Amino acid sequence: MFENPDTITIDEKIILREFVETIPTSIFGPDRVRYIADNADKLAEGDKLALRNFVNKALTRMIESEASDIEIGGRGNEGYIWMRIHGNKERVRDLPQFTEDESALIIINLFNDNQKQHLLSKRNLDFSYTYFYEKRKINVRFRADAYFDLDTLAMNMRLINLSVRPLSSLEFHPLAVRSVSHNYIKFGLTLITGITGSGKSTTLDSIIDHHNKFDPAHIIIIAAPIEYVHTSNVSLIKHREVGRDVLSFKDGIVQALRQDPDIIVVGEMRDPDTIMAALEVTDTGHKVFSTLHTSSATESLDRIIAEVHPSEQERVRNRLADVLISVISQKLVPTLDGKRVMAKEVLIVTPSVRAAIKNNNTSEIYMMINQGGAQGMITMEQDLKKLYMQKKISLESAITYANNKTRIQQILSAK
């Protein structure tokens, strides 16, 4: 059980209260956050450690509650710590409440000087956080984002999986697994897509782990931040964190070409420069994996093309058609037992798909996926039906999570 919050926080509350009392009453809003950032280092080392230990205890609670995310601070939290447990955001009512200033100090105490300056200048900070989970005697990593909520400081921390799921457990068609294998295809682009929290990183890590166990390659991972840290096995794996080891995704991709890679993993194709660099690097005989915040294969193709300047779109469309290998789009759907299961759409690029991309007929691709089961493809609706027939998800969830509501109802009613 998690320790009683009334006994674990008495010292921390005193530390927080005494610090907050030093904040001049004449300053308001973001200036209060700046004051906290400028003066947090004046805390005694023991006080800093006590506040960090409180965060670690809250993270332990998060792990043991099977939560994926924790939220600390910000006006919207109303003093509570919130967690996302099996997909649902919930107040944790038996943890202590904090004022906005107290929460800001708890958050800022996690940062070094460079991170504080980045937060204050950019109004946002992506970072990773690691602590030692005593019960399992392992280091646990979190992806974190600090941001402002109506001039108050807030933070989300997302648990990075303690272990990597075997690629076989994700139930891809053997031909889909073959498409991501460096041993089978030496160069080209594979996209893993989905909304935030859909498990993209889990799938990407499973693919990396598969290479690390069975498919030797030199893999360079460029991410912001680095999440799961892979230990080299049959593959040599390097991790480059944006803002820490390299200045940008584009720089990381360009520099990787001088580092003798076989596979380059780009954490996210979030801007035109990164998209162009990722497409061009496949010209040099490398395999690229990356992610997008899109819900379907066709939406992913349209998004990439729309991200670049209109004068470049025709060239990018042709380049994408030439280098794209596969697109995996996924969602996490509530299960009947209160957990979540991955539903997926898989596009394998065939000559017909390639022609549709080049001719700007991406609307035709859905039916190609629908009819491409023998080639390893599956639509989101087909996979949702399969999960429903396996009695893993409800009918309501199958319809709710479908990209094409009309199509899901048609295939669910078919004999």
Question: How would you describe each model-predicted region?
Answer:
Residues 2-5, 10-14, 18, 28-415:
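Short, flexible helix-loop junctions that flank or precede catalytic/ligand sites
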